[in-house]
């Protein structure tokens, strides 16, 4: 019987060649991009220079490790269920808001529900006085990040004092090998009244629009998804006039964007409810290049909201509303005061 002797050098070359055959991205023809407002995912530690004392054990909320761990597990369950609602194991990319820091994000992606997917985190602490941030998590088998930056939103009150709020997070990379950009937002709230706070959201819209225009000035057909809790609806001026997010599909050359959640809003659906009126604050807005159906290229397939029964209040004055963690200082033990929203892309 012949014996074959392989040199060490040959073995190394063989291993390198074999490993190079492994695809950079998992093979799939569909991708899900989601957004979720986590409704105050805070740890239990009183952090210096951050107004987070209400989420500590000695506060009126009596926030503690048990409640925190339940909250993290709840958020992870919802994120996984967003994927399963569209026959994914878990979403490809998820934009997030209302979390305190990177530590809580590490706990989130390390839960049993999400740990298998190896989610990576894009996050920077924002200057928001409450300490709440925006972030993006992604599956590295489906998305490869090339770069990111936090773009500050500079706004001032009537006396000229700066209002410290969330930045906008721009994350650029390749989804299934195709270049794409995500802009994760949490625009200023309606605290103090919708009309009085309106200029701040218009300023946020101008910033988002300037980021989009900057990218498209170099690549007009760039794939961009603006996502976030905008604290405005699709028919508010900040969204439809300044951001130029239309309610109908746009031509590839159009200056307008496509608001993928707007059709659901005009059907009476929403991601949060206030005084029995549904709002669609949690939106995903696409550049027109994602509306072109070209073979082998990413394009928009559908949009949706995850509003399963377990995510809804089942009784009382708020029957049917999102089942939230707190109502004031009363611990409700639910999930979030927002439903998650998403889009599906395919090629």
Model-identified regions with their sequence ranges:
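N-terminal, active-site-proximal structural segment of metallo-dependent hydrolase catalytic domains
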Residues: 21-112, 122-134, 311-320, 346-347
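Active-site-proximal beta-strand/loop segments in catalytic clefts of secreted hydrolases
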Residues: 36-39, 97-100, 123-127, 139-140, ...
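Metal-dependent phosphoester-hydrolase catalytic domains
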Residues: 21-23, 214-224, 232-347
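Bacterial Sec-dependent N-terminal signal peptides
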Residues: 1-28
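Extracytoplasmic/secreted cell-surface and envelope-processing proteins
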Residues: 103-106, 130-133, 191-194, 233-238, ...
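Extracytoplasmic, non-cytosolic globular domains
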Residues: 123, 169-264
């Amino acid at each position: 019987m012949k014996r074959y002797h392989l040199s060490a050098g040959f073995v190394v070359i063989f291993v390198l060649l074999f490993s190079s055959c492994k695809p950079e991205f998992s093979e799939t023809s569909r991708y899900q991009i989601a957004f979720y407002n986590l409704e105050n995912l805070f740890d239990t530690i009183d952090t210096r220079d951050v107004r987070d004392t209400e989420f500590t054990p000695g506060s009126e909320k009596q926030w503690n490790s048990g409640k925190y761990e339940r909250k993290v597990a709840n958020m992870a369950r919802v994120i996984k269920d967003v994927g399963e609602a569209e026959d994914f194991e878990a979403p490809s990319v998820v934009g997030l808001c209302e979390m305190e820091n990177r530590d809580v994000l590490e706990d989130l992606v390390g839960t049993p529900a999400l740990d298998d997917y190896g989610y990576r985190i894009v996050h920077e602490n924002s200057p928001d006085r409450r300490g709440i941030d925006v972030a993006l998590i992604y599956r590295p088998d489906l998305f490869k990040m090339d770069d990111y930056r936090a773009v500050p939103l500079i706004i001032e009150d009537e006396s000229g004092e700066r209002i410290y709020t969330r930045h906008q997070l721009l994350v650029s990379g390749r989804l299934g090998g195709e270049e794409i950009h995500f802009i994760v937002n949490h625009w200023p709230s309606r605290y103090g009244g919708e009309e009085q706070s309106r200029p701040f959201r218009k300023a946020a819209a101008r910033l988002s629009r300037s980021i989009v225009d900057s990218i498209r000035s170099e690549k007009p057909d760039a794939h961009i998804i603006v996502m976030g809790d905008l604290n405005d609806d699709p028919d508010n001026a900040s969204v439809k006039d300044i951001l130029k997010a239309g309610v109908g599909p746009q031509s590839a050359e159009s200056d307008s964007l496509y608001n993928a959640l707007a059709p659901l809003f005009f059907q009476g659906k929403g991601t949060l409810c206030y005084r029995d009126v549904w709002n669609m604050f949690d939106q995903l807005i696409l550049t027109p290049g994602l509306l072109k159906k070209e073979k082998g290229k990413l394009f928009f397939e559908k949009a949706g909201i995850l509003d399963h029964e377990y995510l809804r209040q089942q009784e009382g004055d708020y029957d049917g509303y999102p089942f939230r963690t707190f109502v004031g200082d009363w611990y409700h033990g639910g999930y979030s005061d927002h439903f998650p929203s998403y889009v599906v892309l395919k090629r």
